[in-house]
Amino acid sequence: STIPHIFFHTLVVDTSRAFDDNIAISKQDGMNKVKDYNYVMTTVDEFCRILEEMYTRGYVLVSIYDVASYETQADGTQVMKHQPIYLPEGKKPFVLSVDDVSYYEYMTGHGFASKLVVGEDGTPTSEYTNSDGSLSYGSYDVVPILDDFVETHPDFSYRGAKGIIALTGYEGIFGYRTSDFWYNSNCDYFDQYFSWNLENNLKKKQTMYQPNPNIEQDKESAKQVAQACRDDGWLFASHTWGHNKVGDSGSYERFESDSRLWDREVKPLLGDVDIIIYPQG
């Protein structure tokens, strides 16, 4: 049988901001984002109703490692093997992931959560910036909302499974601006990764660069969030460092450079990751 994979982006909390042509303007390039948000985003209310509907229809969240895992052969090689999943009759497994949990700068002020933080109980929760600039903390995005749902519907999760958090790295992770490449004035390895189009990329860096004086503290905060997510049952995946559509454009050299940069800037914050979720499919 097939096991569906359902994925989401960061959830829209305040529709009055996200879908307002006068508010949802990217501060980076001046582009109106309403059409994009309407096309690829889900609201908090929609997400909650989707979870309820899937639960009613008998779907059960499973880990991707419940579906298949590595088995070591006699010669030392490893192969992927399907794993048995034991669910009650009438139940159907599915895998869930959430892309781009970086809370990109262009989304600032548009009615989305602003970052993931570690809550008072040690589990991941959301920081949300209200329209008046004040901060609230709670279930404003996929991770804490799904956690809440599983807590009240434990039979929705197989063996404590949660979802996969797919992360890029070019603006950091979880809402923390952790990329030395973009945010550290002392970064000295730009040309090591972008030699394939160095002149144009140097020009782009000059327009994109925004220093973060708190970058080292942000890295530590991101590590704490990563550990809290892992302890809570969440998995991590690479979404490529630069959100590159793999195999459709660019060279192998470009993909290799991107992968090495992800390993350099994101892996130290997350730990080992062996899943990749391709941007744009």
PLM feature spans:
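Metal-dependent polysaccharide deacetylase catalytic core of the NodB/CE4 family, i.e.
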Residues: I6-A18, A74, V79-M80, L87-F94, ...
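C-terminal domain-boundary segment and adjacent tail
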Residues: T43-M80, Q217, K267
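Aromatic-acidic/polar surface patches that form glycan- and anion
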Residues: V40-T43, L135
